[in-house]
Amino acid sequence: MFLEYSKLSNSLNLNSKSHTSASNEESGSHHDHHHSSDEHNGSFDPHIWLNPELTKQIAEVIYQQLTIQYPALKSQFKQNLDDFVSQLSIAEQKIANQFGAQKPLSIYTFHQAFTHFAEHYGLHIEGTITRTPEARPGAKHLSELSKEIQQKSKICLVKEPNFKAPYINSIASETEVVFTTADPLATTIENSPKGYIDFIHSIADSFYQCFE
């Protein structure tokens, strides 16, 4: 079930840096990842499902909408919601424990997809390779980014499996780089009741490789 953005955004407490249309994350369904130019201006990050707390709010909105459309199934929807929130809370704590003892590290991502995840778990993303994944970044941006990275002794660079960007390897030639890959689209995650739990663990495991 997909909800109109206007209905969802009015129902969510989006106190972080960005807003977006939402998909049914409770069922682990995937979404269309087309980005308009407006979506990548400033600090916009539409990937709100990467913050588990916002995902709980999304699940609550979905529950409310489902009970309106199918009132006879309200008790089953409520049980599903409670189970999902409980499982997600357990996953959140496990992930928080993963990152809790790690020393600060400069993290760069391919594009602005992981802001919500990083903020939720206290990780610091210092920069992105490109604002929009569909277009190659400009030479000026790559040059400035390369100079910035060269001043650091070690960074972690988070790639994405759906986009090839060979220029990534050249911008940090004189810096120790830990490469990892994270998929904000959950393209390899099975669409199942625990799909979102598996998904958020996969993102956490990818970022944890930065510290290994």
Stretches found by the model and what they are:
Residues M1-E212:
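Extracytoplasmic metal-acquisition and chelation regions
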